[in-house]
């Protein structure tokens, strides 16, 4: 499956070392303010080569909007966008046409399809996620018009053994202020940890936290399209994701409590944070929080003497997680509008 969503649909295409990566967004209503500059801003946050802790692959990731937008507004027709690959070094992967890399999808894709592109991982490369960021930028443009109070912010909450102490209120500008996208006092230490792993030819995993504010009450499509299920499906489809939790680590710690304490109502009447912003599969109006866990990258520089790789994908995965969340919210909003909800 290369298409995500029901009414607001994203189809991604392209291989890591092919001519281009691309996205086709269908179902976006007409009249939504959208420019190439908006999409480019999103792509720049995911772009490789941002700092010493990311891959050295030098890609400008300049987006071209081919259709669906005229005079700064969507037409209601399919929106096609491409990013040309400019710095692929396919010769680095010539040996992989005959052998499979440990920890990668090479062997299973060969078994499944009987034919694959070994250059840079082909379709399984993390480079595919730039197409998701394009789709997420369009989704955010729609949300800005339809649900202007919605704000989604993600940040690196843990790298290896180091957890981040983030403030209660965050903006993307605060998150992006440090190359690690760790908005806490641990940022410098985490940067040193990633650089040490890079120097040793090793890699690191960790977690990304997400907070969504301004959601209306009732967003979701029970029973199989619950908000929690749709978000989990969206972020679990990102390569290297190994788990999702709701409400943060503090909520996991409270699972040991008896129900009388766990479900105790707050004095101010606001839904308890233990629900993570979701009850009965629907948004409850409180901030929605989740945490997405990533395994360490499988390509280790200590073993792979050729090719270019991130020692830790978390800083560049932040905008990818935000994009997948926005795609879900945009799709569920259109479903809300399309289906009757009152007798």
Predicted regions and their residues:
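Generic N-terminal targeting/processing segments that precede catalytic cores or assembly contacts
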Residues: 1-343
């Amino acid at each position: 499956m290369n298409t995500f969503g029901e009414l607001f649909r994203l189809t991604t295409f392209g291989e890591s070392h092919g001519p281009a990566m691309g996205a086709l967004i269908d179902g976006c209503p007409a009249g939504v303010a959208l420019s190439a500059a908006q999409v480019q801003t999103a792509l720049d946050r995911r772009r490789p080569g941002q700092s010493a802790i990311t891959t050295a692959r030098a890609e400008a990731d300049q987006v071209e909007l081919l259709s669906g937008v005229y005079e700064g507004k969507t037409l209601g027709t399919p929106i096609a966008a491409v990013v040309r690959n400019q710095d692929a070094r396919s010769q680095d992967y010539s040996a992989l046409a005959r052998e499979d890399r440990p920890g990668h999808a090479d062997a299973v894709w060969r078994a499944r399809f009987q034919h694959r592109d070994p250059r840079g991982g082909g379709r399984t490369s993390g480079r595919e996620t730039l197409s998701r960021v394009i789709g997420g930028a369009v989704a955010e443009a729609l949300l800005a018009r339809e649900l202007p109070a919605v704000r989604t912010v993600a940040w690196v909450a843990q790298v290896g053994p180091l957890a981040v102490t983030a403030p209660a209120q965050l903006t993307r500008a605060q998150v992006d202020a440090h190359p690690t996208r760790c908005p806490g006092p641990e940022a410098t230490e985490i940067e040193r940890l990633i650089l040490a792993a890079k120097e040793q030819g090793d890699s690191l995993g960790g977690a990304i936290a997400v907070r969504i504010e301004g959601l209306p009450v009732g967003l979701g499509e029970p029973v199989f399209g619950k908000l929690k299920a749709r978000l989990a499906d969206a972020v679990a489809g990102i390569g290297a994701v190994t788990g999702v939790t709701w409400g943060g680590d503090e909520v996991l710690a409270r699972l040991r409590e008896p129900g009388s304490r766990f479900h105790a109502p707050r004095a101010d009447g606001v839904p308890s944070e233990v629900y993570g912003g979701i009850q009965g599969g629907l948004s409850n109006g409180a901030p929605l929080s989740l945490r997405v866990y990533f395994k360490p990258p499988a390509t280790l520089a200590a073993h792979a003497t050729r090719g270019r790789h991130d020692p830790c994908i978390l800083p560049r995965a932040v905008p990818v997680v935000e994009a997948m969340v926005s795609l879900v919210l945009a799709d569920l909003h259109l479903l809300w509008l399309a289906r009757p909800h009152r007798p």
